[in-house]
């Protein structure tokens, strides 16, 4: 099994193969990807769709001297396997294992780290210009998907690239008719009409030379009609940017891919190759449902993904989705917005029930935020469902277009804190720090499912921009209450009180997901625990009261410490004139790698044992002195 694949330890081995061996190699590589992902979990559909393209690129180009930048990067498992990491696939996305995304520190073949969308053309152009300035003669290649082409950054880069006539730059559009959610927008809908009559007539001589090795024009026209729904933008548009447009060609046909790429190597200036692929290619279950198989956990390939038979705790994403539908049913002004993450953000049901108030704006976070601001000016109640890590991409719009005008936009911030297998690129480590410094913002952190629901309701009632952050995955098992209750603005609650005498009284001020482990630590230490709820406005009265009645304060948050929620507590304490020793716990000042979420929290000292250990080491010389019965406040 894998007789050919076992001989490939780097692309130089691949380039020694006869062309007739490449399709059998592709079959082995696809089977290996399926087998590997079924055992570890990971991104599947996208990787099954890039097997032949990956082989062709490494076969034709002299990697790593020629640079390949993979946009988003979750489709790079075939690339990793062919570049010396075949055996490492058993550790994929596990702690101390290989990353699920390109990583410069992992391999010289990973020329640029990616995970967020639409960055590849900018990076590849920088490499191409840098190569030219250094006197090197190498190609820089950006592989970008149809979904990623909806983002403004991709077009900004193409606008810049089009005037770089002597840059050896190739942009490959991997058109697979599927981003994570289906591609949206007018460019998608009208491609066939705009392109079909003009592409060949406008083709330059260089393009015609490349096409001479591809299928005949009539066959291309047939393929164009077949795949029109998945294509993103017309050939004429790319040519207006200054690119030679080539394609579309079948991205699973090595006999088209390889000679086309070989001819492109002889051309100068920016080239644009349009390849049509199919997500899930070669595995019928993934072909039929590429969304289900986008990022599965472990499963049996022979049986496919089976629904769990054990009752699962409700996820925070589900809590949000249910709340949004309930809120929209009660108030016709509620509008839901997602930047291309309908499934991931829990908006599938909302789209079905309220299609006229559902807006998927594509991978366009900047537009999503300003669009929401515009809706708010018309008296609507926009809710932007967005991952914490992707909100970073719209920071100026958040400040300039929403907060500066004090517009009532709700930001439902999913994937706050550590996210596990996706690692540092997707972690929501910074939102508390970068939100609390913005005037007019209200910022809340949910500690359980029902509190999340009620916080979202509270946010919708505010006359200013308001954010509610919540983590990835299942909650604590707390049942949600159907009836809505508005949480008093800027007010936390004491969940447990210490019985320790003066001199040993510790108060833990916990935010969001850190309430539960803080309570566990407090049981071991007999400490007071406050669920702070609000990062902004911070409950200054509660902070100051705890400072007056306790000897030591500890703040705990699942976010960066610098400028975060703990800093808000320290500021409030200092204003009171009562100064106590403070220990601020949170994510370390480094990028936290991928791995099991519970293990990562433990390594960061943010589980119950870790919090207790840090408190003992900082404040308590004799831990046995603080053992006493727990007292919790309901």
Swiss-Prot record:
Residues involved in Mg(2+) binding: 146, 176
Obligatory cofactor(s): Mg(2+); thiamine diphosphate
Record's catalysed reaction(s): D-glyceraldehyde 3-phosphate + pyruvate + H(+) = 1-deoxy-D-xylulose 5-phosphate + CO2
Protein name per Swiss-Prot or TrEMBL: 1-deoxy-D-xylulose-5-phosphate synthase
NCBIfam families to which the protein is assigned, alphabetical: dxs (TIGR00204), PRK05444.2-2 (NF003933)
InterPro entries: Dxylulose-5-P_synthase, THDP-binding, Transketo_C/PFOR_II, Transketolase-like_Pyr-bd, Transketolase_BS, Transketolase_C, Transketolase_CS
EC number: 2.2.1.7
Cofactor binding mode and count: Binds 1 Mg(2+) ion per subunit.
CDD domains reported in the protein's UniProt record: TPP_DXS, TPP_PYR_DXS_TK_like
Entries under Pfam families matching the protein: DXP_synthase_N (PF13292), Transket_pyr (PF02779), Transketolase_C (PF02780)
PANTHER family: 1-D-DEOXYXYLULOSE 5-PHOSPHATE SYNTHASE-RELATED (PTHR43322), 1-DEOXY-D-XYLULOSE-5-PHOSPHATE SYNTHASE, CHLOROPLASTIC (PTHR43322:SF5)
GO CC annotations, alphabetized: cytosol
Record keywords: Isoprene biosynthesis, Magnesium, Metal-binding, Thiamine biosynthesis, Thiamine pyrophosphate, Transferase
Pathway: Metabolic intermediate biosynthesis; 1-deoxy-D-xylulose 5-phosphate biosynthesis; 1-deoxy-D-xylulose 5-phosphate from D-glyceraldehyde 3-phosphate and pyruvate: step 1/1
Family, similarity comment: Belongs to the transketolase family. DXPS subfamily.
Binding site for thiamine diphosphate: 74, 115-117, 147-148, 176, 283, 365
Quaternary structure and partners: Homodimer.
Keyword Magnesium in record: yes
Protein's UniProt keywords contain Nucleotide-binding: no
Domain of life: Bacteria
Source organism of this protein record: Burkholderia pseudomallei (strain 668)
Function: Catalyzes the acyloin condensation reaction between C atoms 2 and 3 of pyruvate and glyceraldehyde 3-phosphate to yield 1-deoxy-D-xylulose-5-phosphate (DXP).
PROSITE patterns: TRANSKETOLASE_1 (PS00801), TRANSKETOLASE_2 (PS00802)
